[in-house]
């Protein structure tokens, strides 16, 4: 697997669990890059020993998983010209080496896609908070963005260098970066392929550094523009319907002009939904709404 680089962000790990995972991983992958994301000083000895055997990029302070992944991807793109695929994995034992290999193999065959290692959330091993969070995020992601993803929280992802270049500049410094990448795949028409992986939670996932309040807010506020988009889209459709209704009511019988009004307003709504860049949604819809009202 010399054409694959495994990228692992590390922040205050359970050293025993991480080492057991690493011992297995090193037997299958020659290229492993770690991000020391400002680990506590009590981990200095372990991380220093790790740096003697592997490449470790060190953050002086904790900058967040998103920043760590982006810095790691940038480093790999610059220093591994012969590699083709990057696989991101967690250090807490949630991802088996076999599953990492499976995702890497699928990525090699699908260089145009983002590969997600997805868990079975119906499994009794999954903590309730993880099930709940995934259901909410999965449904919001599909409702607002149109992206179908069964495991929005997975840290096991594989991608070609070309896909990595498209995702490295995505906004987000902490856990929201991974969610933002899923949104970006829809915007940039990057296919997502899912690989079923083993569901592993050690000690109810107690080593996770995800803050249920702060990090959830960071994740869900990403969808605020899409909520406004839906609102303004509804306003546009309503205005067009009303205008068409007024124009046609004296010409056609009631069922026909109601149907015509609905058809016209729906067509215009679809055109707006498909062609307006998300960065300019709010401004465009506000301006358009004002113009239509004044017509």
Q: Which residues fall in each region the model found?
A:
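Acidic helix N-cap motif at the loop->helix transition within catalytic regions
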Residues: 16-19, 41-50, 98
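Short beta-strand-to-loop acidic/aromatic patch adjacent to the donor-nucleotide binding site
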Residues: 80-94
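Short, high-confidence coil segments that cap the C-terminus of an alpha-helix
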Residues: 81-83, 110-112, 190
